Amino acid sequence: MHDDFERCYRAIQSKDARFDGWFVVAVLTTGVYCRPSCPVRPPFARNVRFLPTAAAAQGEGFRACKRCRPDASPGSPEWNVRSDVVARAMRLIADGTVDRDGVSGLAAQLGYTIRQLERLLQAVVGAGPLALARAQRMQTARVLIETTNLPFGDVAFAAGFSSIRQFNDTVRLACDGTPTALRARAAARFESATASAGTVSLRLPVRAPFAFEGVFGHLAATAVPGCEEVRDGAYRRTLRLPWGNGIVSLTPAPDHVRCLLVLDDFRDLMTATARCRRLLDLDADPEAIVEALGADPDLRAVVGKAPGQRIPRTVDEAEFAVRAVLAQQVSTKAASTHAGRLVAAYGRPVHDRHGALTHTFPSIEQLAEIDPGHLAVPKARQRTINALVASLADKSLVLDAGCDWQRARGQLLALPGVGPWTAEVIAMRGLGDPDAFPASDLGLRLAAKKLGLPAQRRALTVHSARWRPWRSYATQHLWTTLEHPVNQWPPQEKIA
């Protein structure tokens, strides 16, 4: 989009917040870059350039605007709707792959050489993987500087910088100030720094409209005991992260989500934040979805009633795949009970000072040691879970932020006991494919019949072609028409 100068300039003239995250505005006369909705007077057209990412702007020597804080914008929805290698790379970088495995590890996951990957990213997003990871480190550092009392040395290493000097230089170049000045400026803007060790409070930005009742209701109704709960108006869950465990509390509002993270290790902050955004589908483009689905007369009323539906997703793709298999042909409550047994038997214990969470969801390595006695499911279902876990453990099946959606579908369908419903639900909620469509889902077919749409799988699939590439969101809208606990927020009964 940044290549369309006229459209971008109209967006900054109208200060249209819908475009925040799609591109940044580099101002040649001041050397700063802004988000499209920056409240200052728009610069003359001759004095601006439009760049695809904050990393591209920083790479060309521009500093972040202190007024609009463009590095804190919602992420670009472009990377969530595309399945090409650049989009997959961007999702993996957001998950912290470069900091954990280096550029070589990122390239290997994608099946490209380092040089090929550098060339692709530079051409499309204006920055290579190292520059993109550096911009993320800067954002992590800024959050820790502004919302905690951590010493700056601890901030530097938690954010992924290799030295204090590199940290100070990056802050000065990106923000035109020192860490001390950033913390001082933040004191008037933010709540006082959290007193609890390992705790950080964030405000996750959201593109409006945001129909949070659907996504939070779904997460609440399917909560796994010991791993997830609803308490004091917040959805809470445990996190299994690269450097340790975490607990997150997420409280919705119309234009943001309040996120309280308790982490064993602050090096996990960037990854935890990215996974929370992914869980709630916060980087979706609701305007584009509403425009496309609302064009169908059969869906117009449903979409208009609650525009801005998000897909209830996951913090761990492999976890969701296991839970999807456990949910085959059973009630929502039974699926949660089965998963709760696994959590209690194989999950890592956590200490929850503010609630009743007890364990993380087990890792694939832990599930590889599974005792069938912990699963009160048919033997055929046990075989499916064992085959799924074995494939994930030996890496013949890869389910992560950067996997190829179509290839993953094919690999899932090759497993015994995995049919189209399971594969599509995993693609939709586990992998984030915006065009997944579980046509055989009973709830989806009941909702379709209620609206006068075809209720048979094949006929409904044919009809759904008009909703592409947003069939996952059409599914979510249809589900919301049913009387079911997944559509209740706050839940009518305690979830713990």
UniProtKB/Swiss-Prot annotation:
Its cofactor is Zn(2+). GO terms for molecular function: alkylated DNA binding; DNA-3-methyladenine glycosylase activity; DNA-7-methylguanine glycosylase activity; DNA-binding transcription factor activity; methyltransferase activity; sequence-specific DNA binding; zinc ion binding. It comes from the Bacteria. Gene3D superfamilies: DNA Methylphosphotriester Repair Domain (3.40.10.10), DNA-3-methyladenine glycosylase AlkA, N-terminal domain (3.30.310.20), Helix-hairpin-Helix base-excision DNA repair enzymes (C-terminal) (1.10.1670.10), Homeodomain-like (1.10.10.60), Hypothetical protein, domain 2 (1.10.340.30). In the C-terminal section; belongs to the alkylbase DNA glycosidase AlkA family. This enzyme catalyzes only one turnover and therefore is not strictly catalytic. According to one definition, an enzyme is a biocatalyst that acts repeatedly and over many reaction cycles. Co-immunoprecipitates with DarG in the presence and absence of darT. This is Probable bifunctional transcriptional activator/DNA repair enzyme AlkA. It comes from Mycobacterium tuberculosis (strain ATCC 25618 / H37Rv). The lineage of its organism: Bacteria, Bacillati, Actinomycetota, Actinomycetes, Mycobacteriales.
